[in-house]
Each structure stands twice: as structure tokens, then as C-alpha cells.
């Protein structure tokens, strides 16, 4: 019998690329850590406003951050919840990391005004690529499930109005900024994406 094609992305914090990066500690120099300001001597509370597959949130939590994940798509939220529990049961080390992760279901534009954090990260569905190879299967399946994020400008505005000291937007390296986005404080560039960093005074 032919194998049925998957219609949902795999969310896995134990095996695959996430597990390898964790076991090999390959993420210690990741640009996201620089963008958020996280370091071994500086623990932060980070809100991941677009949790998706949870990979960035897990990386941050594995490096000591306390992370609140917000996911508005019910199917993706359910996949994340299941993966978090599977990782929690895998080992004490993973359980300690998962213990620093809190998953919320809802629209970040609504939830952010009710929350406080040191950093808010935003990694929306990026504009479709037109001159590159097909995106990896997991991201393609995620895009098929959640669709586009036309409201990224509204989400960025909500984050910049929230009680936090820094907002980090992950965006394609050479893509134009989202509509109405103001100039970031600085940028950290990777090979295919950049992190637009907005450093701002706390409201309290």
C-alpha cells in the first residue's frame, strides 16, 4: 500500500533537526540569540508571537530563556502541545527546557497588550519566494495549513506598543520591510534571513 502523503508538518523537539541542534549545541552562535540579546549570563523572558513549529522558541528555552509561545491556528497549537508533552516525557534534561516554555492559543495582537516580557519575537509567514528552490517540506506544509500572514504590520505595531524592551522581526534577507514598519534600531543578517531589531524603552 502506498504511503499516504502528510498534510500537516511534523513538530518534534526530540529528533530531527531540532534534536540534532540541541544535542550538538550547534545553535549557540545562532543569529537569533544575538538579536534577542540572550546570553549565558543574561536570562530573558521572550514572547514568541508566531510560534509556528516552535523551533525558535525551543532554541531560546534551551539556552536558558523563559518563553511564552502564542499560536493562533488551532491545528498548529495542537501539534505544538503534543510535541511539548512528548519532549517532556523523553528525559529530565528536555523536561527542564519544556518547563521554561508556556504555550498559549490565541491572536497575538489581542494577547500582547495583556503580557509583559523582555523581548517579543515575530517570525510570520514570509512572502513566497519566486527565484529560489522550493521551501523545505515542513515549511511548505505549515504554509498550506496556516496560509499567509497579511496582518504582519498590525502584529508588529502591537508588539511595539507592548510592555517589552525589544522586538525582533525575522524577515527574508532582501525583502522589503512589512507595510508601515518603521526603521529598526539595527539589523542582524544571516544567509537567507535578517533580524530587524527594535530596541525601545519599557512602558513601566
Swiss-Prot record:
Which keywords describe this protein according to UniProt?
Cytoplasm, Methyltransferase, rRNA processing, S-adenosyl-L-methionine, Transferase
Q: What class of enzyme is it?
A: transferase
- Subcellular location(s) per record: Cytoplasm
Q: What is this protein called?
A: Ribosomal RNA small subunit methyltransferase J
Q: Which Pfam families match?
A: SAM_MT (PF04445)
Enzymatic reactions: guanosine(1516) in 16S rRNA + S-adenosyl-L-methionine = N(2)-methylguanosine(1516) in 16S rRNA + S-adenosyl-L-homocysteine + H(+)
Q: State the EC number(s).
A: 2.1.1.242
Q: Which InterPro entries is this protein grouped with? A: 16SrRNA_methylTrfase_J, SAM-dependent_MTases_sf
GO-annotated cellular components: cytoplasm
Protein task: Specifically methylates the guanosine in position 1516 of 16S rRNA.
What's this protein's family per the entry?
Belongs to the methyltransferase superfamily. RsmJ family.
What residues does S-adenosyl-L-methionine bind to?
55-56, 71-72, 123
**What is a GO molecular function of this protein?**
rRNA (guanine-N2-)-methyltransferase activity
Amino acid at each position: 500500500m502506498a504511503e499516504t502523503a502528510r498534510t500537516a508538518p511534523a513538530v518534534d523537539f526530540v529528533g530531527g533537526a531540532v534534536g540534532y541542534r540541541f544535542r550538538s549545541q550547534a545553535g549557540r552562535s545562532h543569529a537569533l540569540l544575538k538579536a534577542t540579546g540572550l546570553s549565558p549570563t543574561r536570562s530573558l523572558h521572550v514572547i514568541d508571537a508566531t510560534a509556528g513549529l516552535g523551533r525558535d522558541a525551543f532554541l531560546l528555552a534551551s539556552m536558558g530563556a523563559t518563553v511564552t509561545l502564542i499560536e493562533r491556528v488551532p491545528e498548529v497549537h495542537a501539534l505544538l502541545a503534543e510535541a511539548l508533552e512528548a519532549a517532556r516525557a523523553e528525559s529530565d534534561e528536555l523536561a527542564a527546557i519544556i518547563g521554561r516554555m508556556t504555550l498559549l492559543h490565541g491572536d497575538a495582537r489581542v494577547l500582547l497588550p495583556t503580557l509583559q516580557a523582555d523581548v517579543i519575537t515575530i517570525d510570520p509567514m514570509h512572502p513566497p519566494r519566486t527565484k529560489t528552490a522550493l521551501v523545505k517540506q515542513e515549511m511548505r506544509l505549515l504554509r498550506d495549513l496556516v496560509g499567509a500572514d497579511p496582518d504582519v504590520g498590525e502584529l508588529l505595531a502591537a508588539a511595539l506598543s507592548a510592555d517589552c524592551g525589544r522586538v525582533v522581526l525575522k524577515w527574508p534577507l532582501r525583502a522589503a520591510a512589512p507595510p508601515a514598519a518603521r526603521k529598526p534600531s539595527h539589523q542582524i543578517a544571516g544567509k537567507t534571513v535578517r533580524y530587524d531589531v527594535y530596541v525601545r524603552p519599557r512602558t513601566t
